[in-house]
Every structure is written in C-alpha cells, then in structure tokens.
Regions:
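Short, charged cytosolic
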Residues: 49-73, 219-229
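Short juxtamembrane and helix-loop transition motifs at transmembrane-helix boundaries
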Residues: 73-85, 236-245
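Membrane-embedded catalytic scaffold of the fatty acid hydroxylase/desaturase
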Residues: 120-241, 305-394
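C-terminal, active-site-flanking charged/polar segments
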Residues: 282-295, 299-300, 361-370
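Short, non-transmembrane cytosolic segments of multipass membrane proteins
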Residues: 35-64, 177, 199-215
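Alpha-helical bilayer-embedded segments of polytopic membrane proteins, i.e.
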Residues: 82-128, 155-159, 212-227, 243-293
Length: 400
C-alpha cells in the first residue's frame, strides 16, 4: 500500500501487478512516513487477497462515495436498526449473573474458594464493560440519555471505571485509529508502539521496552488497576464546561459508591490476607481479560503519521484486524472480533456485526481494499512480533 497522501496504492512498477507477500515476522508495523510500502498478512475468506498495486488511485470524491455506497447498502439491509429485544435479554442476564457472583461471595464467606469467585467476577466485570462499551457507542437505545445512563451505571457504578473519561479517550481512538500522536491507544506509556518511542527510552524504562513482548501479558494483569486510576485522576481534572463538571460530579459519586462498597464488602467478608488475595486475583484477571479482548484489534496493523491524509473507509479498514471465530468468540470478545465492521459503523448493535461482515468483506474485495482477518492465537502472535520488533533499537546485540 503506497504512502501517497490519500490513496494508499503502490507506485507503478514492472512488478506492480503481483500480490505482495506479508512483511517478515520481525518487522514492526510502521507509519506511512517511515516507509513507502506497508504490507499486511491479509486473509480474505472466500476471496483472493486484495492487490492494492493493481488498483488506480481513486479521486477524493470517489473515495467519499465509496463509503457512502457501503453505508447505503448496510442501511438498506436493516443492520443499523436498534435491537431492544437482544439488549433487554443481554443486560438482564448480565445483571443476574453479576448479582449471583456477589451473592455467592457473601454465602461462601471466609474461604480460599473465594479465589474462584474472584475469577468468575473478573469475567462478569469484563462482560459488564462490554455493555458499557455498547452504550457508549449508542448501540443499545435510540435515546442518547438512556445510552449514557446505562453506560454510567455499568461502567462507573458496577465496575468502577470512569465512563466519561473512557468515552473521550475512545472517541479519539475511533477518529484516528493507529495515527501516531493522535490515537491515545498507541501513546507512549508502559508499552512502546513505535521505534521512535523506543529509541528515547533509558534506564528501567528501556529495559521494559527491550523485553516488552515477553512482558506484555503479565503487564495486562495491571490493566484493571491502571483503568481505575486513570478514571479517578480524570475526576480531578477541572477543565471543561459547567455541564461536564456537573457530569463529573455525578460520576465521582458513582465511582466512590463502587469503590467504598467494593472494599467494605471484601474486607467485611474476608480476613485481611484473603481479602488482599481476592482483590489481586479479581482485578488482575479483569485486566488480563479486558486487555486480551482489545489487544488484537489494531496492534501490529499499519500505522499512519499524524499528518497522513487517508479517507475514512481506508483509515478504518486498513488499521483494524478481525478475529475469525463463532458465536462463543462473539460472546467472549464482546463483538470486538468484528473490529472492521465496528469501526465503520460504531453505532451498529453488536448482534448485527456478524451479518454486516460479509457485506463489508465483499465490498472491500470489489474495491481492492485489504481486509485483514485471522485467528485469535495468530492475532496474539502478530501483536507480540510487532512489540518485539519495536523494541529492537533497545537491544544492543542488534544493529539499527
């Protein structure tokens, strides 16, 4: 895919008509400004791999009309309609299971068997987070107010994550996925996502970057705690309008209610050592499950420089990775396995994404747009290879 400003097509050459091979496993995803050609491990079920080299660059107007045509086709299929029946059952069943978990916690009492309860509640916290995610994208109800109410209850009150903070961050991600310096999900932090981020590290931070592929899954055990802390810190940010400050105050009340209720319940039922172990297992597995659900979506996919101009359709498709699976995969990953369809139509209800997949995949094949789908384990392997390659400049035994 050529790094021309908006087309992402390869320059003409004697070999331009041949399908490009995937990049070597050790090569990290790079921005379009770092290299001329970005290759991906494309897997098109039922079609041949798209060959961007054989497609002439569309004009800006035609690119816009491509997404408009896809949007019309999806809308005519009825897949953007709300699914109140599905979400009534989904939300109700999730609340019952969450309540059952806490009831079991109270009934079991002082016992190391509570670590199994902690594992169950970690699963339910993540599933509750998926519902908060759906509400944040206005997938559940036609009313924005109802969606936000559901989102705040599920995120702030039930699992202790700041709904407002997450929505602001997640909207920036959806606007420019995998854009360096624009997508907060690839901002420099514990993990380096670009070699430029890795090169400036020193000391313990550099050691972390050198070994980040090996440490990735262990670090996810801290993701739940990191999300809690980030949400609480956002509550103390005084920036914003009067309305946003009022909203923050209400969120702060819900978060405080969750935190106080959680700690009181755990330390009231369990002795101190068991209570600490329960919290460690519960929050650790919650972070691991949440992180493993979101990690395959974009990590290791093509990345754009801040000022790269890419039309909406390609911006969302080329940076996203779908996970091949079945209905259990849909449940376990909260519909995030249809990441391409979700990014193209964020407000599409979760159960409709699997039906939209064939429409989107066929459309992409027809227009020569690379559509990336792989298995879950393969996606983790791709993510780890990318993280290992990004940390390459920090390993002195290699030459850069």
């Amino acid at each position: 895919m050529q790094a021309r400003a908006a087309g992402l097509h390869c320059a003409a050459s004697p070999r331009a008509s041949r399908t490009r091979r995937p990049a070597p496993a050790s090569e990290p995803a790079r921005t379009l400004s770092e290299r001329q050609t970005v290759t991906t491990d494309i897997m098109n079920r039922g079609t041949e791999p798209a060959d961007p080299a054989g497609i002439s660059e569309p004009s800006p107007g035609s690119r816009g009309s491509e997404y408009a045509a896809l949007s019309r086709e999806v809308k005519q299929s009825g897949l953007l309609k709300r699914r109140p029946g599905y979400y009534s059952v989904k939300v109700g069943a999730n609340l019952l299971l969450l309540a059952a978990g806490w009831t079991a916690f109270a009934l079991i009492g002082d016992s190391w068997w509570q670590l199994l309860t902690a594992a169950f509640l970690a699963v339910m916290f993540t599933q509750t987070g998926f519902i908060g995610h759906d509400a944040g994208h206005h997938q559940i109800a036609a009313s924005k107010r109802v969606n936000n109410l559901l989102g705040r209850v599920h995120a702030d009150l039930l699992i202790g994550l700041s709904y407002g903070w997450w929505i602001a961050k997640h909207n920036r991600h959806h606007s420019h996925p995998n854009y360096v310096d624009r997508d907060p999900d690839i901002a420099d932090g514990a993990i380096a996502f670009t070699q430029d981020q890795a090169r400036v590290r020193s000391g313990a931070y550099a050691w972390l970057g050198r070994h980040q592929a090996w440490l990735f899954f262990p670090m996810l055990l801290l993701e739940g705690l990191a999300l809690h802390v980030a949400g609480v810190r956002a509550m103390f940010d005084r920036a914003g309008t009067r309305t946003s400050r009022v909203t923050k105050l209400s969120e702060a009340g819900l978060l405080t209610g969750h935190l106080v209720g959680y700690l009181v319940a755990v330390f009231l039922v369990l002795p101190p050592v068991q209570a600490v172990c329960f919290i460690a297992v519960h929050q650790g597995l919650f972070g691991l499950y949440m992180g493993c659900s979101f990690a395959p979506n974009h990590k290791g996919m093509p990345m754009f420089a801040k000022d790269d101009k890419v039309d909406f359709l390609r911006r969302q498709v080329l940076t996203s990775r779908n996970i091949r699976g079945h209905r259990f995969t849909d449940f376990a990953l909260g519909g995030l396995n249809y990441q391409i369809e979700h990014h193209l139509f964020p407000s599409m209800p979760r159960p409709s994404l699997r039906h939209a997949q064939e429409i989107v995949r066929t459309f992409c094949a027809r227009h020569g747009i690379a559509y990336h789908e792989t298995g879950l384990l393969s996606s983790y392997a791709q993510v780890l290879r990318h993280l290992h390659a990004v940390g390459g400049p920090l390993r002195p035994e290699l030459e850069y």
